[in-house]
Amino acid sequence: MEKFTTLEGVAAPMRIINIDTDRIIPKQYLKTIKRTGLGQGLFSEMRYNDDGSENPDFVLNQPAYRHAKTLVVGDNFGCGSSREHAPWALADFGIRCVISTSFADIFFNNCAKNGILAIVVSPEDLEKLFQDAERGANATLTIDLAAQTIKGPDGGTLHFDIDEGRKHNLLNGLDEIGLTLDQKAPAIDAYEAKLAQREWA
């Protein structure tokens, strides 16, 4: 899993509440167990018209936001069914951070397992970030995970809270398997060293 240290890039605003996982990645894209290629289906019911053409009004189709790395979204993002394809689709599109006032618990946990930083902020701070993100190409946010800060385009800084375990895993690029290996590495090394001393074993 890619480490998350500092992320600098355009933030796309989505002033919509209760965006569920079916809107993030519709069910027709769930047939695969690969984590790649899902970016094309991200928000597809909003991104594309019935004839398959792009909806020019959707934020991620607008030139300023096509390469957004952060989403600033409405309350209760990621509600609905517990499909891990939702963070897979976000990551495949290039989204590394999502900021809201609240997330569905399962989606929130799945983000961390897939290298995406989900940040919870107050309604007042979210409104500031929406206003920053609505600047288009100038909507650059810098997220420093170690310092737990979000710096806006004018240099204003917001602080956010995060569980220390989740922070450690993201900073070090550890998913569940990586975390297990990281914790057990000394014991594994000791066992292998012991075996090396017993050439007859």
UniProtKB/Swiss-Prot annotation:
Q: Which UniProt keywords apply?
A: Amino-acid biosynthesis, Branched-chain amino acid biosynthesis, Leucine biosynthesis, Lyase
Q: What is its EC number?
A: 4.2.1.33
Q: Which reaction does it catalyse?
A: (2R,3S)-3-isopropylmalate = (2S)-2-isopropylmalate
SUPFAM superfamilies, A to Z: LeuD/IlvD-like (SSF52016)
Gene Ontology cellular-component terms for this entry are:
3-isopropylmalate dehydratase complex
Q: InterPro entries attached here?
A: 3-IsopropMal_deHydase_ssu (IPR004431), Aconitase/3IPM_dehydase_swvl (IPR015928), AconitaseA/IPMdHydase_ssu_swvl (IPR000573), IPMI_Swivel (IPR033940), LeuD (IPR050075)
A molecular function annotated in GO for this UniProt entry is: 3-isopropylmalate dehydratase activity
Pfam families (UniProt xref): Aconitase_C
Q: List the disulfide bonds.
A: none
Its pathway is: Amino-acid biosynthesis; L-leucine biosynthesis; L-leucine from 3-methyl-2-oxobutanoate: step 2/4
Q: At the top level of its lineage, which domain of life is listed?
A: Bacteria
GO BP, sorted A to Z: L-leucine biosynthetic process
Write out the coiled-coil annotation as residue ranges: none
User: What family classification does the UniProt entry report for this protein?
Assistant: Belongs to the LeuD family. LeuD type 1 subfamily.
Q: What is known about its subunit structure? A: Heterodimer of LeuC and LeuD.
Function summary: Catalyzes the isomerization between 2-isopropylmalate and 3-isopropylmalate, via the formation of 2-isopropylmaleate.
What's the protein called, per UniProt?
3-isopropylmalate dehydratase small subunit
Organism listed in the record: Methylorubrum extorquens (strain PA1) (Methylobacterium extorquens)
What gene is this protein a product of? leuD
